[in-house]
Amino acid sequence: AAWMPARENRATTDVVTPPDGLLISLADAKGHLQLDSDFTGDDGRITALIRTAADYIENEAGIAIQAQVLAARFDRFSPVLRLVRGPVSVVNSVKYFDQNGALQTVPAEQCRVSRRRNVALIEMLPGHTWPDTQRAMDAVAVEYQAGYSDAGLYPSQALHAARILVRHWYDHPDLQVTGTIATTLSHTVDALINQIRDRSEG
């Protein structure tokens, strides 16, 4: 059967370049764990827990907190392309596979990017239209820079949730492997993540 695109042109988002730093510092996490700053035996493990917590929070909240490069992939062009995992600072490129399967780039000067909270919208300027694409999954790819420009802008709820998750997984290493959290703790973390989500959607 011929390939048919989904009715709703939603993006799948992948990380191209992950964040350089940590959502909370190693010293911050060790302080919350009540570990002596001179004790370094678990530094590698704690750092990994911080990264896991950051991934969990960003995925659940549907936003990018730390600065990173993302790629949103669509099955086709639609009048407006929605980049839902923001905040978006810069759109690097809009690329697509043409009807012959060759990779092409939409000229940046033909597009307009507008931002609403953590969502960025891309549309063609008057006088221009989106080109035809190959009928295939992920025919369109938008690469963009996302995340807060300064650590001082990180949502406080995200920092608090990260500390809670790091403590929980540090105390229960068997749960770290699956990235799961206890039900009672889940309510607290979910409440914090919901606040981030509500703030993002405004």
Enumerate the predicted regions with their spans.
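Divalent metal-cofactor coordination and adjacent catalytic microenvironments
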Residues: 1-202
